[in-house]
Amino acid sequence: MTQLISIDKEQEEAGMTQATELLDPALKPAETKAKRSSRKKATTAVVEPATTIAPTADVDAIDDEDSVGEDEDAAAKAKAKVRKTYTEDSIRLYLQEIGRIRLLRADEEIELARQIADLLALERIRDELLEQLDRLPSDAEWAAAVDSPLDEFRRRLFRGRRAKDKMVQSNLRLVVSIAKKYMNRGLSFQDLIQEGSLGLIRAAEKFDHEKGYKFSTYATWWIRQAITRAIADQSRTIRLPVHLYETISRIKKTTKLLSQEMGRKPTEEEIATRMEMTIEKLRFIAKSAQLPISLETPIGKEEDSRLGDFIEADGETPEDEVAKNLLREDLEGVLSTLSPRERDVLRLRYGLDDGRMKTLEEIGQLFNVTRERIRQIEAKALRKLRHPNRNSILKEYIR
C-alpha cells in the first residue's frame, strides 16, 4: 500500500501545472545612464608559485578577445548616445519650429472653422460619389456634383485644406502642453505628441464655431482622449481595456488626493470607500495594473546579468521527466500482471489516469456492484502487488 501511495504521489505531481510568479514592478532596475564609465577588464591573471605560465601567444590571443569585446561594448554605447542625442535634438528643433507659429485670434478661428466646414461638405459629396462610381471621382465630376465651376471648386478645396492645416499648426503647442502631463506612462514623449496631434486633427474636423466656445477648449478633450487611448492600447505588453485603464487612472488620482488630505498613505479600505467599490474589485484592478518585466532585463552596473538568472526555475528538469516516464512504463508493466477488473479498480481508486481518487461507492456504481465487493477486489490486487516479484520493480522509485 505504501508503494502504491508513493506511486500515486508521483502521478499527481506529474499532473500539476507550473505556477507563474508575479513580479513586483519595484524589481525593475533603474534606467541605464547615457554616459557610463568604460568597462574594466574582467580577467586578471593570478599566478601561483606552482602554476605554469601560459605561452605568450595564448595570452595575446586572450587579450585580443577581451579587446574585441570591449570595442563592441564601446561601439554599442556610442550608438545609444548618438541615438539619444539625435532624439533630444529632434524634439528641441520641433518645439522651436512650432514656437514660431503665431496663435490665432478668435475671429480668425471662426473664419478658418467656416472654411473647414465647407471642405468637409465637399469631402462628404466625394465619399458619396466614391460609393456610386466605385472609384475616386475626377475633379470635374466632383465639381459637377457640387454644382460649381471647376476653377471655383478647386479654389474652395484649396482654401479648406489650407484652413485645416493652419488651424492644426497654430495649436500644436497645446498638444505639447497636454502631452507633458502624460509622460512616463509607457509611451515616449514623441509618441505622445504624435497621438495628441491626431486628436487635434480630429478636433479641427469636428469643431463647430457656432457653439460659442474657443477651439482650444474643444480641442483639449480630443487631444486627451487620443493620448489616453494610445497609452491604453500601446504602452503595455498585455493590453488592458480602455475603461479599465481609465479606472486605474481614477484610483491613482484618488490615492494622491487622500494622501494629501490625510498626510499619510491611505489604506485599501479608504480608497475603496472613496471610489465606491468593493475591496476585492480594487485589488483586482491594482493587480491588473502591474506591468510585466522581461526576464532579459539587465541587472547590475555592468549589465552582464539578466533578471532570469536570479529566478529559480520551478519546472521539471529533463532528469525528472525521464524518471517519471520510466515510472509510468514500469507501473503499467506491473499493473498488466493483474486481472482487467483489478487493474481498473486500482486505476480509479488511486487516480492513476486523471489524478482524482474515487471512493468505493463511486467505483461500485460504475461496475454495478456493492462497495464491499470493490473493497475486496482492491485488497486482493494490493496483496498481489506486494509480492516480491512485482514490487521489486518499483522499489527503486520510493524515496
Curated annotation (Swiss-Prot):
Record's compositionally biased regions (Acidic residues): 60-73
Residue ranges of the annotated DNA-binding region, renumbered to this chain: 360-379
Record-linked InterPro entries: RNA_pol_sigma-70_dom (IPR014284), RNA_pol_sigma70 (IPR000943), RNA_pol_sigma70_r1_2 (IPR009042), RNA_pol_sigma70_r2 (IPR007627), RNA_pol_sigma70_r3 (IPR007624), RNA_pol_sigma70_r4 (IPR007630), RNA_pol_sigma_r2 (IPR013325), RNA_pol_sigma_r3/r4-like (IPR013324)
Quaternary structure note: Interacts transiently with the RNA polymerase catalytic core.
Lineage, highest ranks first: Bacteria, Bacillati, Cyanobacteriota, Cyanophyceae, Synechococcales
MF terms in GO: DNA binding; sigma factor activity
Protein name: RNA polymerase sigma factor SigA1
Function of the molecule: Sigma factors are initiation factors that promote the attachment of RNA polymerase to specific initiation sites and are then released. This sigma factor is the primary sigma factor during exponential growth.
HAMAP family reported in the protein's UniProt record: Sigma70_RpoD_SigA
A single GO cellular-component term on record: cytoplasm
GO biological process, one term: DNA-templated transcription initiation
Residue numbers spanned by region Sigma-70 factor domain-4: 334-387
Pfam families with a match to the protein in the record: Sigma70_r1_2 (PF00140), Sigma70_r2 (PF04542), Sigma70_r3 (PF04539), Sigma70_r4 (PF04545)
UniProt region (Sigma-70 factor domain-3), positions on chain: 246-321
Record has Transcription regulation as a keyword: yes
Family assignment from sequence similarity: Belongs to the sigma-70 factor family. RpoD/SigA subfamily.
Region (Disordered): 1-73
UniProt keywords, alphabetically: Cytoplasm, DNA-binding, Sigma factor, Transcription, Transcription regulation
Localization, UniProt: Cytoplasm
Positions of the UniProt region annotated as Sigma-70 factor domain-2: 167-237
Keyword Nucleus: no
Segments carrying motif Interaction with polymerase core subunit RpoC: 191-194
